[in-house]
């Protein structure tokens, strides 16, 4: 695939921590990001293989279902270059005198991805500053 620059805008933000806490400073913020639909992604994968788009979709969807089943049983799943899928949940704090009840105090069980640093670190990219988009007003002129 052709390499496009990562677009960004420069915005002013009040820094809330660190040596610049309380100061208004300029930072770069990613911009111009598009979302690639799953079907288009599968079309691109299919073009490089002997599989059809439907077969690629089916394999990816089935792999995620199987991985979710393993994680639901408390296992960690090595998901290749993407990283590791691990079980996670949120827990409410309970006082020392109160009995911990998992049905009440544990909530939102989920699959968490621990991304592979080598895969998710972008190398060889270049950047292009773009003008900040202005919000359109609905007031007549």
Regions found by a protein language model. Give the residues of each.
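Strongly charged
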Residues: 1-58, 65-141
């Amino acid at each position: 695939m052709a390499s496009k620059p990562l677009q960004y805008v420069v915005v002013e933000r009040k820094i809330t921590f660190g040596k610049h806490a309380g100061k208004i400073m300029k930072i770069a913020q990613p911009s111009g990001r598009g979302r690639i639909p799953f079907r288009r992604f599968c079309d691109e994968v299919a073009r490089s293989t002997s599989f059809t788009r439907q077969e690629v979709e089916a394999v990816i969807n089935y792999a995620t279902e199987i991985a979710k089943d393993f994680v639901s049983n408390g296992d960690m799943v090595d998901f290749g270059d993407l990283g590791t899928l691990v079980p996670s949940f949120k827990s409410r704090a309970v006082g020392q005198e109160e009995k911990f009840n998992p049905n009440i105090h544990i909530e939102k069980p989920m699959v968490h991805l621990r991304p592979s640093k080598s895969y998710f670190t972008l190398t060889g990219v270049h950047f292009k500053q773009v003008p900040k988009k202005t919000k359109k007003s609905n007031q007549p002129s």
